[in-house]
UniProtKB/Swiss-Prot annotation:
Molecular-function GO term, any one: P-type ion transporter activity
InterPro entries noted in UniProt: ATPase_P-typ_cyto_dom_N (IPR023299), ATPase_P-typ_P_site (IPR018303), ATPase_P-typ_TM_dom_sf (IPR023298), ATPase_P-typ_transduc_dom_A_sf (IPR008250), HAD-like_sf (IPR036412), HAD_sf (IPR023214), Heavy-metal-associated_CS (IPR017969), HMA_dom (IPR006121)
Recorded superkingdom: Bacteria
Positions of short motif CXXC motif 1: 14-17
Enzyme class: translocase
Catalytic activity: Cu(+)(in) + ATP + H2O = Cu(+)(out) + ADP + phosphate + H(+)
GO cellular component assignments: cytoplasm; membrane; plasma membrane
Name of this protein: Copper-exporting P-type ATPase
Gene: copA
Alphabetical UniProt keywords: ATP-binding, Cell inner membrane, Cell membrane, Chaperone, Copper, Copper transport, Cytoplasm, Ion transport, Magnesium, Membrane, Metal-binding, Nucleotide-binding, Phosphoprotein, Repeat, Translocase, Transmembrane, Transmembrane helix, Transport
Length: 834
């Protein structure tokens, strides 16, 4: 028997996620229908709630059974048509929709640590999703679990954690930790290398590293000094390895601890009981333990410094908010801390000020630099009634404005939150690295043991020496750290660089999908064009003059919300408009009504044809206007066509240049519009569009996208984020030209903070560059380990008669991580080609 189960969803961030969950549910034979939004699902069928939840989890998201909720006391004031467009996948932001918590982590050294911490956090009751970022040493946790429970779970897994609620405090603590960590690694590297280098040089020049009766006491002192180095400069490796062992796990620190520990124990055994070893096996490796610890600490220090550079983009955003605001009251003006500013307060801005909160100008004019927020390099003129956003700078002028959004609810705060979430996310390509990392260290230990056994039983004499060298070198050269950093470092740098160009990326998956696109579909109105239609010509027929035709058309359009209506009303200006009775909106056709005793029709040719109004006599004029890219709006009075109003929405100033960039990059460009084919083709020709899909109603846009996808195309849809919601959700990547609007920021896979198609070209270029960088890092890490481990195991011995020195292995290990981080940081200097 069929039943409807209501589920609460978590982890969905855009229309693509909604689509994935819906498809996963509908693929089940026991599901008849699945209605999915970004926060909930209503599923009809015979499947149980547990089965549905498991299906959603397999799709990569979380779900729980919903509890009935009371209906709101007041209905939304959003127009019904907007709600219809948005309801499927694009809910507007709410004041309390951010249930995420951020933790600062310590003690993590490689991708194996990430897996352990993530599993520990996800096992806490109330946690719906946990994202651990090795590059930033942070965790982003979604759900209702308390900070204390989260910290305890991380500590129980053998790592450190600190819950941070305030952004400023988080930044301060993160910087303090980073500086302290770099200082610690620096002195540890100096201490270890100060011992290791002289011992190694002396061994190569003045001694042969072999223990004899004459130098036994000296080597014993060197051994004890090396032990002190291992404790003070490398103690963190051994403590971490011990904690991992207690938790039944193994990490990079386990490999370092085993490699250096075995080398030192062997050397000390030879030092204390040389009689137990044959003469040729009395070689000492104290310098190897000290040098390995020194080089790896040096690598960690350089890596930490490079990681700090990768977070610069986010730090720049955090720097945009001033610490104070200038409050205007009846008593005068005074400076108040930003935390005290509340919505409704009146604030003043003067030249050079940075806007503290979002608001609306009530008095004055000013030029504002919004470059850091939107990527728009040209200052914008703002006056009474215009909105201002936190983080922008007053270049010239003075205004009063009323605060509307403060603290975490400003556009800037939401951007920062979105950037941070994107930097903590993982693309599908990163999941391969995670799977390998989960078993990497145990596999390396097994390889080291097997290699050592082979050399012990089948290798040349002295077997014990070769066995030790092989085991130590294999353990030291293996680097799960490079593997773990490969993806997150590229994501942090790529997402941060995109933000500097005014491009907000919802998650890493969006970057990966955007890098594989081959087709870009544009909504026409407001995307390719200015979105401000203008009446460019009025042609009259019969006995109606231009003023009368314009007056009747404007009277009808008073009741319409269509974009063309505003153009006609603007053209009419201050004309006295007659009263209209019986007004009706005819969807996709136009409007009708009665005025001054006449029956009026205003709309496209299809409307007049449907109402049996002859248009044959004016078809030549209709075609002529349409061929010039204008939309012909026809006016009929008492069943007779009397006027044609040519309405044209001009292309954006940078549309042609942006589309040329996309063409050069190899994308096929498609325009999706409700216009008639003649008008649409004229605009497409002017813009440089390859393909036109015309005459499409709003609810048919998603089907048009689906048709393109059925041809095997990877499709991006560029629209305004509200009217194009179904198409944005259907596309492989939805790109909203949101201009900072709530719905656009909170819902799109990619949001452009400025209304410019150059942002589309920038977004796709950065996506390609980021994925390319990510593949370079992963390939480099795989090649390093694929070649390094066999070489360390002695595969070259039969051909060259040489083995890899453990010290060289330690240097290579440190260098591999530094290389990955440095390569990712190249993205911070990436500039899309013009």
């Amino acid at each position: 028997m069929s039943q409807t189960i209501d589920l609460t969803l978590d982890g969905l961030s855009c229309g693509h996620c909604v689509k994935r969950v819906k498809e996963s549910l509908e693929q089940r034979p026991d599901v008849e229908q699945a209605d999915v939004s970004i926060t909930e699902a209503h599923v009809t069928g015979t499947a149980s709630a547990e089965q549905l939840i498991e299906t959603i989890k397999q799709a990569g998201y979380d779900a729980s059974v919903s509890h009935p909720k009371a209906k709101p006391l007041a209905e939304s004031s959003i127009p019904s048509e907007a709600l219809t467009a948005v309801s499927e996948a694009l809910p507007a932001a709410t004041a309390d929709d951010d249930d995420s918590q951020q933790l600062l982590l310590s003690g993590m050294s490689c991708a194996s640590c990430v897996t352990r911490v993530q599993n520990a956090l996800q096992s806490v009751p109330g946690v719906t999703q946990a994202r651990v970022n090795l590059a930033e040493r942070t965790a982003l946790v979604m759900g209702s679990a308390s900070p204390q429970d989260l910290v305890q779970a991380v500590e129980k897994a053998g790592y450190g954690a600190e819950a941070i609620e305030d952004d400023a405090k988080r930044r301060e603590r993160q910087q303090e930790t980073a500086v302290a960590t770099m200082k610690r690694f620096r002195w540890q590297a100096i201490v270890a290398l100060a011992v290791g280098i002289p011992v190694m040089v002396w061994g190569m020049i003045g001694d042969n590293m072999m223990v004899t009766a004459d130098n036994r006491s000296l080597w014993l002192v060197i051994g004890l000094i090396t032990l002190a180095v291992m404790v003070f400069a490398g103690g963190h490796f051994y403590r971490s390895a011990w904690k991992s062992l207690l938790n039944g796990a193994a990490t990079m620190d386990t490999l370092v601890a085993l490699g250096t520990g075995v080398a030192w124990l062997y050397s000390m055994s030879v030092n204390l009981w040389p009689q137990w070893f044959p003469m040729e096996a009395r070689h000492l490796y104290y310098e190897a333990s000290a040098m390995i610890i020194g080089l790896i600490n040096l690598g960690h220090m350089l890596e930490a410094r490079a990681r700090q550079r990768s977070s610069k983009a986010l730090e720049k955003l955090l720097d945009l908010t001033p610490p104070t605001a200038r409050l205007v009251t009846d008593e005068g003006e005074k400076s108040v801390p930003l935390a005290e500013v509340q919505p409704g307060m009146l604030l003043r801005l003067t030249t050079g000020d940075r806007v503290p909160v979002d608001g609306e100008i009530t008095q004055g004019e000013a030029w504002l630099d919004e470059a850091m927020l939107t990527g728009e390099p040209i200052p914008q003129q703002k006056g009474e009634g215009d909105s201002v956003h936190a983080g922008t700078v007053v270049q010239d002028g003075s205004v009063l404005f009323r605060a509307s959004a403060v603290g975490s609810h400003t556009t800037l705060s939401r951007i920062i939150r979105m950037v941070r979430q994107a930097q903590s996310s993982k693309p599908e390509i990163g999941q391969l690295a995670d799977k390998i990392s989960a078993v990497f260290v145990p596999v390396v230990v097994v390889i080291a043991l097997v290699s050592a056994a082979i050399w012990y039983f089948f290798g040349p004499a002295p077997q014990i020496v070769y066995t030790l060298v092989i085991a130590t070198t294999v353990l030291i050269i293996a680097c799960p750290c490079a593997l773990g950093l490969a993806t997150p470092m590229s994501i942090i740098s790529g997402v941060g660089r995109a933000a500097e160009f005014g491009v907000l990326v919802r998650d890493a998956d969006a970057l990966q999908r955007a890098s594989t696109l081959d087709t870009v579909v544009f909504d026409k109105t407001g995307t390719l064009t200015e979105g401000k239609p203008q009446v460019v010509a009025v042609k009259t027929f019969a006995d109606v003059d231009e003023a009368q035709a314009l007056r009747l058309a404007a009277a009808l359009e008073q009741g319409s919300s269509h974009p063309l209506a505003r153009a006609i009303l603007d053209k009419a200006g201050d004309m006295q408009l007659p009263q209209v009775n019986g007004f009706r909106t005819l969807r996709g056709l136009g409007v009708s009504g009665e005025a001054e005793g006449h029956a009026l029709l205003l709309g496209n040719q299809a409307l007049l044809n449907e109402q049996q109004v002859g248009t044959k006599a004016i078809e030549a004029e209709i075609t002529a206007q349409a061929s010039q890219g204008a939309t012909p709006v026809l006016l009929a009075v008492d069943g007779k066509a009397v006027a044609l109003l040519a309405v044209r929405d001009p292309l954006r100033s940078d549309s042609v240049a942006a589309l040329q960039r996309l063409h050069k990059a190899g994308y096929r460009l498609v325009m999706l519009t409700g216009d008639n084919p003649t008008t649409a083709n004229a605009i497409a020709k002017e813009a440089g569009i390859d393909e036109v899909i015309a005459g499409v109603l709003p609810d048919g846009k998603a089907e048009a996208i689906k048709h393109l996808q059925s041809e095997g195309r990877q499709v991006a849809m560029v629209g305004d984020g509200i009217n194009d919601a179904p198409a944005l959700a259907q596309a492989d990547v939805g790109i909203a030209m949101g201009g900072g609007s709530d719905v656009a920021i909170e819902t799109a896979a990619i949001t452009l903070m400025r209304h410019s198609l150059m942002g589309v070209a920038d977004a796709l270029a950065i996506s390609r560059a980021t994925l390319h960088n990510m593949k370079q890092n992963l390939l480099g890490a795989f090649i390093y380990n694929s070649i390094g481990i066999p070489v360390a195991a002695g595969i070259l011995w039969p051909f060259t008669g040489t083995l890899l020195n453990p010290v060289v292995a330690g240097a290579a290990m440190a260098l591999s991580s530094i290389t990955v981080v440095s390569n990712a940081n190249r993205l911070l200097r990436f500039k899309p080609k013009e």
